Amino acid sequence: MTHSASVPAASPTALEGRVALVAGATRGAGRAFAVELGSAGATVYVTGRTTRDKVSEVGRATETVEETAALVTEAGGEGIAVPTDHLDPEQVRRLAARVEADHGRLDILVNNTWGGEHLIPFGRALWDTPLDEGLRMLDLGVRSHLITASLLLPLLIRHPGLHVEVTDGSAETNRRFRENVFFDLAKYAPIRMALGLARDLEPHGSTAVCVTPGFLRSEQMLDGFGVTEENWRDALTEEPHFAVAESPAYVARGVTALAADPGRARWNGRSVTSGTLAEEYGFTDTDGSSPDGWRYFEEVVFGGKEAGPESYR
């Protein structure tokens, strides 16, 4: 299918003067959030556990927070790398103190910490899942988000700002059981956090939204299929549903559009997909397409509708 030229989410100056922090920005959607916010002119603090000198439990030395910060600056913003383990409250307190000392406020917080792909035991019963691995998933997907929000949101409420919780799966999809109790809880919690934080933030003029990408062409996913961003369609022979996959930039453009929207309060408390945001704001993926992966899964994969994946991009 031929698509039109790529359409960005915002102008190069839409977020000029804004201060953003992307927690979990080493790779994948997190890196893209940081870069796209930077491309709109924001100053972006990028955090994560993998640095030039240390590799996290994810086990990928190929992406670092320093590299992400450099990409933010290259895109037109100011990238600031702050290596941080968001499960350590003291490290997050130091991070908050640095942002306060530098700018006195925070306008955009993207809570994207995870790094638990290597722990997911699809199809395994609770009692067959090693307890330490299951609890680690909850640490990475829930506890880290609570620590981050608790210690950084006091900076965000000083001026009307945007808090984004990031999960995997639409609200409709996450109402289904996600094949393992620990993983299910880890991915449903951000949806509930956004709903609860919406009430907490509204009196301060701030907004909380939960956002999910679709079938994400992250570095890790591409490596798993043995393809690159250039030849990713070669993976369709192994996984036909990958035809609705999207680049990390797509969901990141959605978050950038939210951040630049003075009327974003209408999204407060909602859980939205990259496809929904693209339909609302008119941006596209980097190849000019507009994937709607979760609608495809709901209607075709789960719902039995007879339609091909190309009609959902």
Language-model segments: which ranges?
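Active-site-adjacent segment of SDR/Rossmann-fold oxidoreductases
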Residues: F33, G196-S206, P262-A265
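Catalytic loop of short-chain dehydrogenase/reductase
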Residues: G115-L119, W127-L131, M137, I157-P203, ...
